[in-house]
Amino acid sequence: TISPRGIDIVQLGGASDCPTVQNFIFVADVSRFVFAFGCNDYSSTVQDPMLIRWSDQESVTNWTPAATNQAGSIRLSHGSEIITCVQTRQEIVVFTDSALYSLQYQGSPVVWSSQLLGDNTSIIGPNAAVAASGVIYWMGVEKFYKYDGRTQTMRCDLLRHIFQDINLAQASQVFAGTNEGFNEVWWFYCSASSTNIDLYVIYNYSEDVWSYGTLGRTAWLDSGLRNHPLAATYSYNLVDHEQGNDDNVSGTPVAISALIGSAEFDIDDGDHFGFVYRMLPDITFRGSDAASPQVTMTLIPMQNSGSGYNNPISAGGNSTATVTRTSTSVIEQFTGQVYVRVRGRQMIIQIESNQLGCAWQLGSPRIDIKQDGRRGNT
């Protein structure tokens, strides 16, 4: 049994009009105020989910507004409840279930003022927002947002992948974290069939790139003064991220499965079939611990966009050999080029690895492709 170490502030000497119920408490370390969000009003025990109160500056006990102190309150109007807040250098950004507000310190007599930053927004849970490099990012119910002085909906290539496989009944478990060493924001969430966190999505705000994967984490703390980000697991371990090349959460190294794929590409907007006969992978294995690191590169053709992957017969007399359904090549440390025979109207490239100690970086792969018959040819 863990004994609580917290102290009810109403029991402290000099306590005055302290909130007795609230959605959450927030300490503004820059301005040195204590805030109660979604709390009861003065001389009342009824909770108001849209009310914000703050104590006198540098006081945790004095919540009674007076001409001689800076305690006060403000009620927000857009939304039905306050969900969370995020502090930046200039303001405290407050999220309701349908709007975004800014709280800014004004000094006496107003003390704190509110400004509506955006309406008709959403946030999926109380821990789904985070600040990185002066910008606030958060996961909404069906989309992602950011605030950099103005509220914006973010472009996300993975919206369908994420929101068609998420357990909204467990939305309160969603949490965000930063990995500023790699210019990333992470969100962890439960898949549609799980009540525990098992998926993540990453946004790289420097490159405007999204990625995703499977991982069970219950808490996340960026590196800060440490060398690596720290995360908590369901097996009650604290693990360093971005250290080493393998998954060592259990004490036994396990290879990390990695995969990246391109969008579909074609020639002449798909008016012609393309025949690929050579690829230059442009992959380096700098940082690998494996003696012979390698990845698998796969070229996958399609006869028509949306038709699925298939094996059309080569047309136009350009190929006298069997054209494979897909072309899979092992890329090793000194592989400069690989020869293939693949034909399709659209194609994608995939690179994947599942090897202990393997680390790799993808540059700008190139392919040699030529026309091989027009639309409708067989």
Which positions does each model-derived feature cover?
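Polar, enzyme-active/binding microenvironments
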Residues: 1-35, 40-45, 62-66, 76, ...
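Generic beta-strand hydrophobic packing signal
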Residues: 2-7, 85, 279, 365
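Beta-propeller and closely related beta-pinwheel folds
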Residues: 5-174
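Beta-sheet repeat architectures centered on beta-propellers
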Residues: 120-135, 141-378
